[in-house]
Amino acid sequence: MVEIMLLMPKKDWQWRYSDTYGVLSVSLGSEMEFLTPYKSKSLIPDALSELEFSVEHAKFYIDFIELLSKSLTISDAMKVQLALNGTAAHFLLKPQMPKSWFFDTSSMCVYSELGKVFQLKCRGAIAQVLVVETSIQASLVMLLSNELPLNDNKSLMQFECIKVMHDRLHPLKVSRAIAAA
């Protein structure tokens, strides 16, 4: 069961593009606004005008918080931040082609699913990413680490998303104790 959360979806929640900040935001009632990192060039056209935070969005948000509670040990505030950004990415980002060429191939086969955390390796750097959308061959992942330089001119910043083929997702290192029978 979900522990007490800071923010549960309400009927008056709305997506809107903030011209002031140049990013998609979620109006969380009369006095609160949450800013996503997503700029106009990465958003679907509907996201550039006021848009209802629908029942489908609310269900995804709540389910995502539950998944985060199982996969990450983080504060409720961070769960809400990841879930709002994840919901925005899942529903309101333009479809992307995979950009796998930036990342090292994994030697292990992984099973990608919503809310699962993996590592991406790029130019000797290792970053943690969170799956926000998955298909048979590729996943849209959100960067959990602060920044990941992709090349000399481009970096992925925290909470930004990139689509990668599953063969680029590296499992997290898990240490397991083996008990003798």
UniProtKB/Swiss-Prot annotation:
GO cellular component term, pick one: cytoplasm
Key word Cell division present: yes
Primary location recorded for the protein, binned into one broad class: cytoplasm
Subcellular location: Cytoplasm
Assembly description: Interacts directly with FtsZ.
Domain of life: Bacteria
Annotated protein name in UniProt: Cell division protein ZapC
InterPro entries linked to this entry: ZapC, ZapC_C, ZapC_N
Entry's Gene Ontology BP terms: division septum assembly; FtsZ-dependent cytokinesis
